């Protein structure tokens, strides 16, 4: 039986083993937030779309003196293979200024492993409708929507359909904006090409599931740097968040072209976004994402800003949390531009070392 067969026939909570994993995931999530001193509430918000439950974290702003132009909450949407807990200390810092919600997308983390359409265009629409139904259920008039990577792609797709529900659109190193680079494979060695084609035959995180209980140890060996940003529980969290029915991976794979690009990139439709929606791109100077092309395509638009955080990689919110929060809150503070500190990266002098 293939992973696709599993994804279409067996729900995440169908066995006691899976239920145990879901409980352990909730515990790991709780430990990460607790270690960071974050006071949060958690609930599974049920929406009409296939009775999907969306894991929702709420952190209320306790700073009564916070004065922002925007009265609307910050909503965080994670990237591929991630979940609410990976926003980490960024949530704590953002909540000093505004109420914060973070959700696990359907098919990821502790949300339902919803089966989406096998048609990429339909599947994307279903995901956007799930986000909209969540907004309605939460009774949020508008949102300051912050999306990272794949979450940035989906946030933009949402803004294209529901611009009146967006106060600010903030894209943290978003995936899926540029066209396919045909020279990518040419730059790989024969061994890298062979490995690349093997990976494409499976769901992206299949290897993590295949090693079973060794998953956390494998993650620790591959990403020892994560322990510098989170507690050691992050390795259990990432493994458990991706050990369930991989419906989120399946939709990501269906929307992607060789995983690295989108089949329907935002380069073809970003210009359709309502010009009254302020957009801020926040890229990591050392990210693998082609931010230079993104900035060239969209950076000169009147309602768009482009910022590069030097020294940060793809996970800009974790690599330089202080600068990331300054840029996000800058949008809420005076509507479009503005930082909490006057320093700014000189975009003409960026030195980028791709990973």
Swiss-Prot record:
Gene3D superfamilies: alpha/beta hydrolase (3.40.50.1820)
Domain AB hydrolase-1: 73-319
Annotated Pfam families: Abhydrolase_1
GO biological processes: lipid homeostasis; phosphatidic acid biosynthetic process
UniProt xrefs under InterPro entries: AB_hydrolase_1, AB_hydrolase_fold
Cysteines joined through disulfide linkages: none
GO cellular component, one term: mitochondrion
GO molecular function (one): carboxylic ester hydrolase activity
Family: Belongs to the peptidase S33 family. ABHD4/ABHD5 subfamily.
PANTHER family xrefs: ABHYDROLASE DOMAIN-CONTAINING PROTEIN ABHD-5.1-RELATED, RE40534P-RELATED
Protein name per UniProt: Abhydrolase domain-containing protein abhd-5.1
């Amino acid at each position: 039986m293939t992973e696709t067969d599993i994804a279409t026939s067996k729900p995440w909570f169908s066995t006691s083993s899976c239920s145990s994993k879901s409980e352990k995931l909730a515990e790991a999530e709780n430990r990460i937030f607790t270690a960071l001193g974050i006071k949060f509430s958690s609930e599974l918000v049920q929406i009409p779309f296939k009775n999907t439950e969306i894991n929702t974290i709420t952190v209320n702003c306790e700073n009564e003196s916070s004065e922002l132009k925007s009265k609307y909450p910050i909503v965080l949407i994670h990237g591929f293979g991630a979940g609410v807990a990976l926003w980490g200390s960024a949530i704590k810092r953002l909540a000093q200024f505004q109420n914060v919600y973070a959700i696990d997308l359907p098919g990821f983390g502790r949300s339902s492993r919803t089966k989406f359409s096998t048609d990429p265009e339909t599947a994307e629409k279903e995901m956007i409708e799930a986000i909209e139904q969540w907004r309605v259920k939460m009774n949020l008039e508008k949102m300051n929507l912050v999306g990272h990577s794949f979450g940035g792609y989906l946030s933009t797709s949402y803004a294209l359909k529901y611009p009146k529900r967006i106060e600010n659109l903030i894209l943290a190193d978003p995936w899926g904006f540029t066209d396919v680079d045909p020279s990518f494979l040419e730059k790989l060695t024969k061994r890298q090409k062979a490995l690349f084609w093997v990976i494409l035959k499976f769901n992206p995180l299949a290897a993590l599931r295949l090693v079973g209980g060794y998953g956390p140890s494998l993650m620790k060996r591959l990403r020892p740097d994560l322990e510098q940003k989170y507690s050691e529980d992050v390795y259990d969290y990432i493994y458990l968040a991706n050990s369930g029915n991989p419906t989120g991976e399946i939709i990501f794979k269906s929307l992607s072209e060789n995983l690295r690009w989108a089949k329907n990139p935002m380069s073809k439709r970003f210009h359709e976004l309502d010009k009254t929606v302020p957009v801020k791109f926040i890229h990591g100077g050392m990210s693998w994402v082609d931010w230079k092309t993104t900035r060239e395509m969209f950076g000169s638009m009147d309602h768009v800003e482009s910022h590069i955080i030097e020294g940060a990689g793809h996970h800009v919110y974790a690599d330089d949390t202080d600068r990331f929060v300054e840029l996000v809150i800058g949008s809420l503070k005076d509507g479009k531009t503005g930082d909490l500190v006057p320093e700014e990266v000189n975009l003409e002098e960026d030195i980028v070392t791709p990973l």
